[in-house]
Amino acid sequence: MRLILSLPVLAVVLAMVLEGPAPAQADPHISSSLESIPGKLKEFGSTVEEKFRTAIDHIKKSEFSEKTQNWFSELFHKVKEKFETTF
């Protein structure tokens, strides 16, 4: 008996939820919020670009990258000398 009564109540609640907000509850400034999206995306893009450039500069100037670059250069010269003496 309870299941028979709860199913119509569930159907009514589901219909109310799927109906969405009433026109009085809807955001009247939806067009202005849609117009501001390109500006926000541009601002987000410039912020990400600035942070990325800062991170890359930090990596380039770090001691680790300098040591790694020197190590690879030395290794390359050693291999090059080895080939020159062998062939």
UniProtKB/Swiss-Prot annotation:
Compartments in which it is found: Secreted
Matches recorded under InterPro entries: ApoC-1_sf (IPR043081), ApoC-I (IPR006781)
Keywords assigned by UniProt, alphabetized: Lipid transport, Secreted, Signal, Transport, VLDL
Protein origin, superkingdom: Eukaryota
Pfam families per record: ApoC-I (PF04691)
Signal sequence residues: 1-26
Regions annotated as coiled coil: none
S-S bridge residues: none
One MF term in the entry's GO annotations: fatty acid binding
GO BP annotation list: lipid transport; lipoprotein metabolic process; negative regulation of cholesterol transport; negative regulation of lipid catabolic process; negative regulation of very-low-density lipoprotein particle clearance; triglyceride metabolic process; very-low-density lipoprotein particle clearance
Keyword Secreted set for record: yes
The keyword GTP-binding belongs to this UniProt entry's keyword annotation: no
A GO CC annotation given for this chain: very-low-density lipoprotein particle
Function comment: Inhibitor of lipoprotein binding to the low density lipoprotein (LDL) receptor, LDL receptor-related protein, and very low density lipoprotein (VLDL) receptor. Associates with high density lipoproteins (HDL) and the triacylglycerol-rich lipoproteins in the plasma and makes up about 10% of the protein of the VLDL and 2% of that of HDL. Appears to interfere directly with fatty acid uptake and is also the major plasma inhibitor of cholesteryl ester transfer protein (CETP). Binds free fatty acids and reduces their intracellular esterification.
Family classification: Belongs to the apolipoprotein C1 family.
UniProt-recorded name of the protein: Apolipoprotein C-I
Organism: Pteropus vampyrus (Large flying fox)
